[in-house]
């Protein structure tokens, strides 16, 4: 399967990971995201939209697309995010033990990851069969009396020429919350720590965090944890704050891009 062989070999491991270790991980990640947002998202929105694993192709050239290669690599990256480094490496070892030298498929790859980690990826498999770019909308609310911060996250994928009906995907949505001094607020619920990668699997979900002692500034979709379009009503103050305080280099860059885009639109209008 080309998405596995090229997405894993050429793009994920060699380009993304090797280039990151050799040079700047942040710069390499930013370049990858630029490719996704500038080119692959456009392909998803075009008459040529197709899933990573097409049901049928007319000729071999149909395999050489940004969706198959670049989006395929992002999907592998999401699996790494969901499983963690140790389980991902176990999955890689099992995958090569089973399929080295054979014509393995996307399903073979995901199955190896599931078997090695004991993590259910059945819902996640939709990334391979559903075309289009998901749009994730985030709304938040803070209650100073209860010190609770609420995120309401919804997802939708616009219809594409090849698929009119869309289903919710399993989206790993990485976040961080910052207090007024730029310190990270630990994520907690019911006295227990909460993973900073939220598992968004439904059309709409609500996440409530306890012991948030200050109106937080959220960093959303940290490291571009999923190839989605993010909708959130940022204020200029929030974006400026993230440019100064976000621990994640990508989040600082992304905040700067969003702020710049806001002022460009104001001047054009």
Where are these regions (language model features)?
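Active-site proximal loops enriched in glycine and acidic residues that flank catalytic Cys/His/Asp
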Residues: 56, 153-155, 177-179, 232, ...
